[in-house]
Amino acid sequence: MHRLLAAVGMIGALTGSTLAQIAGAQPSAQAPGPTWPSKAMRIVVPWPPGGSADMIGRILAEHLGNAFGQSVVVENRPGASGMVGSAAVAHADPDGSTFVISGIPSHVVAPATSASAPFDPVKDFTHIAYVGGAPIVITAHASLGVRSLSELVASARRSGNAMGYVSPGVGSLGHMVGEYLARKDAIRLEHIPYKGGVQAVTDLIAGHVKVGAMTWTTTRPHIRAGTLTALAVSSARRFADDPGLPTLQELGYGELVTTTWWSFSGPAKLPPDMVQRLNQEINKALDAPDVRRKLEQEAIVTEKMSPAQFTRFVETEIGKWGPLAKAAIGAQGSGN
């Protein structure tokens, strides 16, 4: 417990000056040929179809296909908390045809907690563009009869058995949030990982598991239907469309002001001119009204970053979440 809380303490210690000291990756490569892209492009989504990463991959595939006049296909390659699909991209030729939807599970938590990670999350990738982030919502099945996070904590303390909670998978931000809450409040929560949010929420709404830590994207319809009760959200401010839902910060969990994020990366040593063009096109996509509308509907907040800024962001997230991930996952074993 003390190891995990110490790791969380490191999160708040990261400041702007710390971020400024982190060097961005500067891949060395030749400029792209004048005919690039000369063949179909592939965006690997290292998660199953139906989740936020999949939606973002398909949005970007459509935009880039139109922008470059080339076919762009989306390939779902889930497994090992996103490392299977990500490794395929890390080992691909840097010819501008293969990319990945990157994020916290695959490029921050999994590499930090695996003794045999098949890639370095910074050195083996060209980090091209940040897309956006969404907060985690703590939910309870209506049959549990709790209406607040404090009631959930009290219920867990009264229970003689560990209370199961679901997340989209090992190393997801929902996993991290749940593990921290368990130790902070000295309650017994058992992490039940799934291969994506769609499968996790299916069992949650069926009542097979009583607690969830997932994005607003996957839980909102069931919260509005009354099947799930929203208890707290990890955003810095309350949702405009659900102002009654308190933030974790308000409830005394200031370390958990955070979002799970999605981004666009490719193999290391992509030509800088190519990286810049891709960054510009993705930022254009984020400005498109239809794209903004789709992402806002899923509570995904976009932000534009240059490739250098995004690379520094990834490095900062590794320093921020890596120690916490090692403490949480190491404490409960790699099987979860």
Where are these regions (language model features)?
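An extracytoplasmic/periplasmic, membrane-proximal ligand-sensing/linker region
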Residues: 26, 38-40, 183, 224, ...
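Short beta-strand/turn micro-motifs at beta-sheet edges
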Residues: 30-33, 124-128, 249-255
